[in-house]
């Protein structure tokens, strides 16, 4: 199991839809898409956050059902986020992204009024 986890951590670094930034780097440099998520998504669609998204199943399902919205899943566990990031990459989904960080850090990822909804589904 640990071997798979290390492989997933390594693969996480290759996903364009999975953002992993150290707390120190976030404090020092900020997040490159803060206030500019529309540039990453390539549209001005509303953004919904899912906090504690785990494997990203809910974000992926909603992104499939609502291609006119953008979804961002947050979780601290990289091995879990791997599943969602991999699925979204395999399906070439452009309306879903994932961020690996602690929940209390989310304000550093968004400008005021950049997020339409925040969901906690557990």
Language-model region placement:
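Conserved beta-strand/loop positions that form the S-adenosyl-L-methionine
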Residues: 51, 74
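Conserved SAM-binding loop
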Residues: 84
């Amino acid at each position: 199991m640990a071997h798979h986890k290390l492989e997933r951590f390594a693969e996480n670094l290759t996903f364009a839809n999975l953002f992993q930034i150290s707390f120190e780097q976030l404090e020092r440099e900020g997040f490159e898409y803060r206030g500019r998520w529309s540039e990453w998504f390539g549209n001005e669609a509303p953004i919904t956050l899912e906090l504690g998204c785990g494997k990203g199943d809910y974000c992926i399902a909603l992104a499939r059902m609502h291609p006119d919205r953008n979804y961002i899943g947050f979780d601290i566990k990289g091995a879990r986020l791997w599943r969602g990031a991999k699925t979204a990459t395999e399906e070439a989904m452009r309306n879903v992204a994932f961020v690996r960080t602690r929940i209390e850090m989310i304000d550093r990822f968004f400008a005021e009024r950049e997020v339409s909804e925040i969901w906690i589904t557990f």
